[in-house]
């Protein structure tokens, strides 16, 4: 059994980035590992495949018809992939196609390492903190004592400070809880109800997951690791402090052996 896989939601305007991601995946990711692209419909899947050198290098998932016109389609695609594959793998990494592998890596081991730490790397964040609080309110968890304490009363943010990895031994229980929320359609339609933040808030509230708050030289509006609009000095500081497996430190990532992926590469222009 292959222990882990990666899910990437894509659509035609992003195909050029997905091709780059796939090429880097084939160059750097140790096998066996399985990569899934999630398409909106059969035509998009076919269009993408026409320009792939090796069509067997990835697997495809295609949204069911009732989901194709949902708002916040990226989140919907991620959930669809997770629900479809939840019984097949131990760990699933989910991220966007504007990413590129830059070093040889064993994703199965990396995903296991991230998931088994049972922590989320966070930083104080002005805008991000409000996003977390807003999601908690929609989940009716905003007064949960564990969440209040772990987030330092909604002052931090953690999405994209590390590769988003789902530990599937928790996912079925989470999925059952999530699908029974009375306002699930509202959550699906809300752009800011990001899939991994919903999942991680649930883990903090109901499982033994913690938030580890990292201090950096600079202040950030959202996640420190994803912030690309800062100086190289600030990016280097973040790379050193967070020691994450991925980064937006486009110019200096080669100086940090832990970094296996650079993301938001569409902003490196």
Name each region found by the language model.
Residues 23-32:
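Short, acidic, metal-binding catalytic loop of nucleotide-sugar glycosyltransferases
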Residues 88-102:
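Short beta-strand-to-loop acidic/aromatic patch adjacent to the donor-nucleotide binding site
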Residues 44-87:
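Active-site-proximal specificity loops/subdomain of glycosyltransferases
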Residues 1-20:
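N-proximal low-complexity "stem/linker" segments adjacent to membrane-targeting elements
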Residues 32-43:
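Short beta-strand/loop segment that forms part of the nucleotide-sugar
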Residues 16-17, 44-47, 100-104, 109-110:
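Short catalytic/ligand-binding loop motif for oxyanion handling, primarily in non-cytosolic enzymes
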Residues 102-187:
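Conserved catalytic core of nucleotide-sugar-dependent glycosyltransferases
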Residues 175-269:
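A glycosyltransferase accessory/donor-loop signature
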């Amino acid at each position: 059994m292959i222990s882990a896989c990666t899910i990437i939601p894509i659509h035609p305007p992003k195909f050029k980035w997905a091709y780059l991601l796939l090429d880097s995946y084939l160059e750097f990711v140790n096998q066996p590992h399985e990569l899934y692209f999630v398409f909106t419909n059969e035509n998009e899947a076919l269009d993408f495949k026409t320009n792939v050198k090796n069509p067997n290098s990835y697997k495809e998932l295609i949204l069911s018809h009732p989901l194709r016109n949902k708002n916040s389609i990226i989140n919907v695609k991620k959930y669809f992939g997770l629900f479809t594959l939840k019984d097949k793998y131990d760990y699933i990494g989910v991220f966007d196609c504007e990413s590129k592998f830059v070093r040889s890596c064993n994703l199965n081991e990396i995903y296991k390492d991230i998931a088994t730490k049972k922590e989320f790397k966070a930083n104080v964040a002005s805008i991000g903190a409000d996003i977390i609080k807003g999601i908690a309110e929609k989940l009716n968890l905003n007064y949960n004592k564990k969440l209040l304490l772990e987030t330092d009363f909604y002052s931090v943010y953690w999405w994209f400070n590390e590769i988003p990895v789902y530990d599937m031994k928790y996912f079925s229980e989470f999925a059952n809880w999530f699908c029974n929320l009375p306002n699930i359609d509202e959550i699906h339609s809300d752009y800011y109800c990001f899939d991994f933040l919903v999942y991680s808030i649930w883990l903090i509230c109901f499982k033994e997951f913690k938030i580890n708050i990292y201090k950096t030289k600079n202040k950030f509006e959202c996640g420190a690791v994803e912030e690309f609009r800062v100086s190289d000095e600030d990016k280097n500081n973040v790379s050193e402090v967070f020691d994450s497996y991925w980064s937006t430190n486009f110019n200096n990532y080669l100086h940090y052996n832990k970094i296996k992926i650079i993301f938001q590469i569409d902003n490196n222009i």
